[in-house]
Amino acid sequence: MEEKGKKLGLWNIIGLGLGGAIGTGIFVLLGYGIAYTGRSISLVVAVGCFFMLLAYWYNLAMPSLFVMKGGDYSMKTMLFNPFMSGVSAWMTLVSGLAMSSYAVALAQYLAIAVPSLQNYQTVVAFVAMTLFFLSTIKGSRFLTILENIVTLVLVAALALFVAFGIGKVDFASTFSSADGGFFHGGFTGFVSALAVMGWACQGTTMAPISMAAVTKNPKRTIPLGIIVITCLLAVVYGAMGIVAGGVLPYAETAGQNISVTAQAIFPNALYIFFVVGGGIGAIASSLLGALGMMRYPLLQVANDGWLPSVFKKTDKNGYPYAIYLLFYVISIYPIVTGRSLDAIVSQVMIPTMLINIYMNLACLTLPKKYPEQWAQRSIKMPLWFYNICCVLGAFCAGVVAYNLFKDLTFNDAVFAVAIVVVLCVLSILRLKQGAVKAEDLASKKEEIVRQAIADTAADETEAA
């Protein structure tokens, strides 16, 4: 049911989107990026915001043509064939692997706050993941309030990090490569850092596209909001990168989370605030939010037939315990097997980027298929430029996938390939079994296209 009341304007979308984009990734991955590129990490994260915007080009292109009230689900349904629908559905489950990265990062920060936990990080991560999954049983209202509070604390922590750290950076040498600290790994290292930091820089489109149903003039507001969010995030992350890479020597920050730099720049009280309120709070909030947001996509996967019918089961309150239990098992697998945080991120990002390649290239067909909507697009650009952006978007997604893959260990690379193969095999298998019927998917696609066209026409009439 569509929400009633005052609709969101541009600044509402910017606020929501920026809050959603600034998340856990920058806390836990900045040190891995520094390991590849040294002090040029500031350029990596600033450029990375625009690079990842291109990698998610379809999230900017499609909302400029249509009012997509179903967000990401509607966009993918509109462009996917039956096989890719299955791959995307199974990918929803595989994304559970990424949930473990939050728990691993949380354990790292807890070990900083409570040093006696240093040798028990795997146990802490396992217990944390279990408790967070149990918390989903009680619903999301309290968690949503908590997330809003923690977001304010997070923004305050990052602002303090930049404010206290920027004065301790030696700008005379920060952007110099004389000591090998700037562009530490050369161009290859820069691109590898760009790929690793993609996880932290990819969130600029997620929140805005999910809000189309409650946004005023969404065809204009959402694309414009995404562009502004990306610019602001590039400035914030760039400033953080200057501090994280420029205060301490490379050897002390490479591969470490930013609490190492925070300890060097903050008084003890503010350092504790940064670790607990910023690090632990942000990670916990992100994990709770991610688990809550997965409820309906997971149910959709089960209800569409991609999973056996047992996974449709819910308790008397509607809690989908069967599918959440499966998701939990997937989420704790990297923890109990001891996979590294950067490997976990890579193994989820690689198939995600492969799906993005498909989506970005599929956008090439939209102007011809929907000439009326193309003529009324909110981002006025010539067709040749739009086509270049589609191809560039696929290229950027491919660059991220390739660079993440090449930097994996042999065992992690095999696991990443296995994930992609299993996604494809399960999609084909369920279609051949008739558990999911291609004609049903086609009907759903037609309905979503009709609804998108109708909503777009209604929005244009209202705006006129």
Regions from the PLM with identified roles:
Residues E2-K4, T37-S42, N59-M84, L106, ...:
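Flexible loop linkers connecting adjacent transmembrane helices
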Residues Y32-A35, V44, L54-M129, F133-I137, ...:
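Hydrophobic transmembrane alpha-helices that form the core helical bundles
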Residues M1-R39, M52-L53, W57, K69, ...:
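Membrane-interface "cap" regions at the ends of multi-pass membrane proteins
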Residues V310-Y321, N356-D412:
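C-terminal membrane-solvent junction of multi-pass transporters and transport-like membrane proteins
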Residues G71-N81, I112-V114, G225-L288, L307-I344, ...:
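TM-loop-TM module centered on a large, flexible mid-protein loop between adjacent transmembrane helices
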Residues A157-F161, V348-A375, A394-V399, A418-D440:
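Hydrophobic alpha-helical segments of multi-pass membrane transport proteins
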